[in-house]
Each structure stands twice: as C-alpha cells, then as structure tokens.
C-alpha cells in the first residue's frame, strides 16, 4: 500500500454523500456550509430573493452612495493582493469581535496561513471610500466555486452596512465571472439565507487504516466523540425549537 506509515487521516469539515467504505471511519457533525447555487445572470439571482431583500439592497446601496460619493467596489486577484489590505479587513473583523465581547477566532499563525492562501488562490473584494479600504471579503477560489472566509467593515461606518453591500457585490461579481457556487461557509447569520444560501451539513471525519490504529490516537477519538455529542445536543435543541413554533 502507498504511504504505509500513514495510519490516520482527519478532515475537519467535509460534505459527505456517503460514508467511506474502504477503511474504518468515525464521523461527527461539524457545522453547516451555506451554499448559494449561482444562476446565469445577476437579474436571475435578484429575482430569486424576496422583495424585502431586493428593496433592502437598493436602499442601502443608494444611501451609501449618497452619503459617500467616492464609494467604489473593487476586486483583486491573488497576484495583486496587498498584505496591508488583508490586514485591514482582518483588523475590522477583530474590532467587531472585541466590541461584542467575543474572542477573535484567529491567532497570528492563522492569519499568516490565511494571507498565504489568499496570495496563492484568493480573491479580495473591497469597498473603498476616498481610496481607503472600509470593508472587505476574503475569499478563495477552487474550480467554479468561491468561498468566503472573512467578511468585515470599518466600525466607523456601521450605519452604511458596508460589509453586507460588499458581500452582495461579490456575489454579483462571481455571477459575472461564471462561477457556479458561492460558499458563505459556517456560522448562521440571517444575511446568508436572505441572499439565497442553503445549509449543507458538514462532517468531521477520522479515517483509519485499520481498527487497531484507533488505539494510537486516543486524543483524536476523544475530540471527535465530544464533537458528536455536541452535534447530537444541538440537533435536540433545534428539534425542540421547531416543535415550539
């Protein structure tokens, strides 16, 4: 067999149609990826949204342009992305988390890896005001798919909904490029479903070469077991909430 020293493989987030059959595996619910299947045209996408959402997009875009006439939307491909732009958007995200009293989810190493990934296969979308980045999306490209990793805006412009508008414009840009799917990724936020995202269950997977190899990785087994328990409890809460409504 190839790679005989490899006894275990862990995948933290995957969409599985069926369990792998060749090797023993353990699975646990991970989260949901909100996926938007992109139509052939911007008009078709807008028509698929609710009338309220379409009006909300028009209202906030016109209001932002009226308040900030220099506002413009731009995209940058991997080779033209500047680290200062990436740090600005990540900084906006950090400020938002801190303002909410929540822990920022990326340490310095996470940020370095994300910046390296952006330079390799990323697309940066920004809204600028007077030539300064005030909102942005950090996305990666894979085939016909585009995935959003970070969305953030300058807290000084909270009232203009720049993050939401930048996301809308990025979806429209993806349609113009001929992309097939837009992945909002995990985390339930109202705007993802308003813009057409549908939840797709993601699974955490531990794949073993043989059952006996499970004994070599007790920590991985414990972590996955706890993840499965959390997923089960979450599904119970969701069913209870649905029953109340």
For each feature predicted by the language model, list its residue ranges.
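Aromatic-residue detector
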Residues: 96, 105, 125, 134, ...
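Residue-identity detector for threonine
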Residues: 7, 53, 75, 125, ...
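Active-site/acyl-donor-binding loops of N-acyltransferases
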Residues: 19-44, 48, 129, 179-245
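Acyl-donor binding region in acyl/amide transferases
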Residues: 1-30, 143-200
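A conserved beta-strand-loop-helix scaffold within acyl/acetyltransferase catalytic domains
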Residues: 11-36, 40-159
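Intrinsically disordered, low-complexity, positively biased terminal segments
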Residues: 1-20, 97, 101, 231-245
């Amino acid at each position: 067999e190839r790679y005989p020293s490899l006894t275990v493989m862990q995948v933290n987030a995957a969409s599985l149609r069926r369990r792998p059959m060749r090797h023993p595996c353990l699975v646990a619910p991970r989260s949901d990826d909100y996926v938007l299947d992109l139509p052939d045209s911007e008009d078709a996408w807008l028509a698929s949204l609710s009338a309220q959402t379409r009006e909300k997009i028009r209202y906030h875009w016109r209001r932002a342009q009226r308040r900030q006439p220099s506002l413009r939307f731009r995209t940058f491909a991997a080779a033209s992305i500047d680290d200062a732009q990436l740090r600005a958007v990540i900084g906006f995200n950090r400020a938002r988390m801190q303002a909410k009293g929540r822990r920022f989810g990326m340490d310095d190493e996470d940020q370095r890896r994300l910046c390296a990934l952006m330079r390799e296969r990323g697309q940066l979308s920004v809204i600028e005001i007077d030539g300064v980045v005030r909102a942005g999306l950090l996305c990666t490209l894979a085939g016909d798919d585009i995935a959003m990793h970070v969305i953030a805006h300058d807290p000084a412009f909270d009232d203009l909904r720049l993050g939401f508008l930048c996301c809308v414009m990025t979806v429209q840009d993806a349609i113009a490029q001929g992309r097939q799917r837009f992945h909002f990724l995990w985390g339930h936020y109202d705007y993802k479903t308003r813009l057409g995202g549908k939840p797709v269950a993601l699974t955490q997977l531990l794949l073993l070469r043989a059952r006996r190899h499970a004994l070599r990785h007790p920590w991985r087994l414990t972590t996955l077991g706890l993840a499965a328990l959390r997923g089960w409890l979450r599904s119970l809460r969701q069913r209870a909430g649905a029953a109340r409504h």
